[in-house]
């Protein structure tokens, strides 16, 4: 008995601060994913507004939404129509007026809000505009358990390890990754998948914002750190890959038991400030 899941990873350019245009483009990608029987679709970091803190930081407050705001309502109808889970990274309002999160919403196949994740490791100029998250939820879907992190989070092994220990069999990392760091992009997700014996995918923007060029090149790796599929560089693309999450449980139990054989009593240094 297998637990196959078909995952669609969206590599798209965004129109700065134009939610309507970006959501219409997202709809097209969702329709394409439905034609390929996708169970889940994930968009890149801040896909509905554009990313650049330098260019649009002061306007984040104007485009921020509640988790169940207009973007959710638009995507929820598509989730129901196509029976597809949707991971949508957007600017989220916090519980404190004026404080924002670089976050995401997760929508179920029947159009319900499953929850949110807020980026915990803020990069550079993000710190001036966003509050860092402080929790690492996992999402129980009908095919398995999914963990989420955003861009810079992927460089911290602790994040994916916590997600794996919480049961994640598939970890998704929507990003806005610049071309100058492509060597890191090519290393991040294979490392995280091998360390945690699970599937890991990077979902990147494509396009230019000011002097920041984002190159796409979505990737998905298996539980041994092997690259299963990748999208081209420099173009919009929908990468679709089917994975069997039963392979994760088998691999963790019988092949390389990294999670079971941790020596947590020796790891005190990990909780100390550097």
Question: Could you tell me what each predicted segment is?
Answer:
Residues 6, 87, 103, 135, ...:
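Conserved beta-strand and immediately adjacent loop positions that scaffold enzyme active sites
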Residues 138-140, 205-274:
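C-terminal beta-strand edge segments of enzyme domains
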